[in-house]
């Protein structure tokens, strides 16, 4: 789940208002087709003019101060983003494998991990040895992810990133989940033994090269849907243990989109759940530099012009940000979606299934990046189902979700939209490697 911060309290950039009443019934909305690419209208021009007037009214000095403080002119640059630029598939060593894991997809960019590294000669710079993945108990979103499924899947993403990076080095990562007899609820998630192996295949090299280019894309997609052959290629040489199900039929895509809008509004209306997410927003550059995690304006899929405007204008309240998120979901994310993917497992409550689902998700995102597709993780429906279950409230989404997708909610672990992006995705901040890596014995 991602709650964009509103740049001005207006409609999302690159979109026009949805004329459809959000209270339409499922039967009515099932007749809607994904809407085509829109052209700027009078309202879009008025929005841009309003932003310009607001900036002028703020005064040149104030604009400069806020713009500098919020990183308006250096998006995606500086220390919090160095790992993306520095990582290379050709660099050997266990630390490089951990760096790949740190760049993996994870919920809300909470980066819920740290790693114990034990090289065969006693150094973290060794190319063979062991890596222990451990959960950081302080990095959680207890209301957005009440049963911990997304966090656990994030560990699976990190494990798969290590597997891919190891193969690029001609190594093999042998994963032992919950080692030494640990409980599957233990914070000791896995031990990875890195050993010498055959040279990588071209496919393995392709996936590894995508690691530093993989970013979540939250902007609009073009009207051209990915071809089925391209979608099929995303699961080539994919890890076992989970299944990817595509939703591509136009009416089904529209109905899934309606559920996303409904779930997003329900999250926004849930003050505590909304606050749990908003706590991970880094509203200006000083917060990004201090925390090097969480969600930022840079990653909301805004155009360059709108991003600068959003950073110059004062930060919005949580409520205004939620309003913008709902509009973005309705008028950009679902309106331009042509394809959804769902990670299906046997049981979303099973810890091993969660790891396997995360491994598959990371594979698909890397494969999508390699062929130039944008991918946007969208879990509002399953998050809302889990939240209602945790509060013993009526479940309003599961039956409709299963009817549209053919996947029961207890088997729907994660979901996303994928397509041809209209603009480049920007990187999210990452912590210093030294903050997540511990040499053995520390």
What is the meaning of each model-derived region?
Residues 2-442:
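Acidic, surface-exposed loops and disordered segments
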């Amino acid at each position: 789940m991602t709650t964009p911060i509103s740049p001005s309290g207006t409609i999302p950039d690159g979109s026009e208002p949805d004329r459809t009443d959000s209270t339409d019934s499922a039967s009515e909305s099932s007749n809607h087709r994904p809407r085509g690419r829109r052209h700027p209208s009078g309202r879009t021009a008025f929005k841009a003019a309003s932003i310009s007037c607001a900036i002028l009214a703020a005064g040149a000095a104030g604009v400069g101060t806020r713009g500098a403080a919020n990183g308006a002119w250096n998006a995606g640059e500086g220390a919090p983003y160095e790992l993306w630029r520095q990582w290379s598939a050709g660099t050997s060593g266990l630390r490089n494998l951990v760096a790949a894991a740190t760049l993996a997809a994870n919920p809300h960019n909470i980066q819920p991990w740290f790693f114990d590294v034990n090289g065969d000669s006693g150094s973290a710079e060794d190319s063979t040895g062991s890596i222990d993945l451990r959960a950081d108990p302080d990095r959680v979103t207890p209301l957005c992810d009440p049963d911990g499924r997304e966090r656990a899947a994030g560990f699976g993403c990190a494990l798969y990133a290590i597997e891919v990076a190891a193969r690029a080095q001609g190594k093999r990562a042998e994963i032992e989940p919950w080692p030494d007899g640990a409980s599957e609820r233990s914070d000791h998630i896995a031990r990875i033994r890195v050993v010498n192996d055959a040279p990588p295949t071209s496919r393995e090299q392709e996936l590894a090269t995508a690691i530093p280019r993989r970013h979540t894309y939250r902007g609009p997609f073009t009207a051209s849907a990915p071809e089925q052959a391209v979608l099929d290629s995303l699961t080539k040489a994919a890890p076992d243990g989970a299944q990817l199900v595509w939703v591509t039929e136009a009416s089904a895509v529209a109905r899934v989109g309606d559920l996303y809008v409904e779930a997003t509004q329900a999250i926004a209306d849930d003050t505590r759940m909304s606050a749990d997410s908003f706590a991970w927003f880094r509203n200006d550059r000083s917060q990004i530099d201090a925390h090097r995690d969480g969600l930022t304006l840079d990653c909301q899929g805004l155009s360059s012009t709108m991003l600068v405007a959003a950073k110059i204008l004062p930060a919005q309240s949580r409520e205004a940000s939620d309003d913008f998120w709902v509009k973005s979901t309705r008028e950009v994310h679902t309106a331009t979606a042509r394809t959804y993917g769902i990670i299906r497992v046997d049981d979303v409550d099973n810890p091993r299934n969660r790891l396997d689902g995360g491994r598959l998700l990371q594979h698909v995102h890397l494969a999508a990046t390699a062929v130039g597709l944008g991918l946007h993780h969208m879990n509002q429906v399953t998050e809302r189902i889990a939240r209602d279950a945790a509060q013993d409230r009526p479940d309003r989404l599961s039956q409709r979700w299963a009817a549209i997708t053919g996947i029961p909610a207890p088997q729907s672990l994660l979901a996303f939209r994928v397509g041809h992006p209209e603009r480049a995705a920007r990187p999210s901040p990452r912590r210093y490697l030294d903050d997540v890596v511990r040499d053995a014995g520390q």
